[in-house]
């Protein structure tokens, strides 16, 4: 898949698997939007690593559990770059439940 100059949004893109995806997409020539919710320093570090390697990236904050944050993030990317070509839905929404209440695991979030 040719990703050269494509706009790639990686949710949770500053740490773990998201960071690896961000780095690989940038290595292949994508312009990477590194999303973070609370991990700003890690996202900025990932952007810096990409830029030092000759790639293009920027950090963008949004809590993916909040629809308004997601809409604002997409609008900001579209306003700046015209589109989002690639989406890596890496970030997750977690909810802690008691181990003795497995019924709670089947409820909708």
From Swiss-Prot:
This is Short-chain dehydrogenase/reductase homolog YusS. It comes from Bacillus subtilis (strain 168). Belongs to the short-chain dehydrogenases/reductases (SDR) family. Signal peptide: none annotated. PANTHER family: 3-OXOACYL-(ACYL-CARRIER-PROTEIN) REDUCTASE, 3-OXOACYL-[ACYL-CARRIER-PROTEIN] REDUCTASE FABG. Gene3D superfamilies: NAD(P)-binding Rossmann-like Domain. Pfam families: adh_short. InterPro entries: NAD(P)-bd_dom_sf, SDR, SDR_fam. It comes from the Bacteria.
């Amino acid at each position: 898949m040719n990703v050269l100059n494509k706009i790639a949004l990686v949710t949770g893109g500053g740490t773990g698997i998201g960071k690896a995806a961000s780095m690989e997409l940038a290595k292949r020539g994508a312009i990477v939007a590194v999303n973070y919710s609370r991990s700003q320093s890690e996202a900025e570090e990932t952007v810096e690593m990409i830029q030092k390697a000759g790639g293009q990236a920027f950090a963008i904050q949004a809590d993916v559990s909040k629809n308004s944050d997601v809409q604002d993030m997409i609008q900001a990317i579209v306003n700046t770059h015209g589109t989002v070509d690639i989406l890596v839905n890496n970030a997750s929404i977690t909810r802690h439940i008691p181990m003795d209440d497995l019924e709670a695991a089947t409820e909708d979030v």
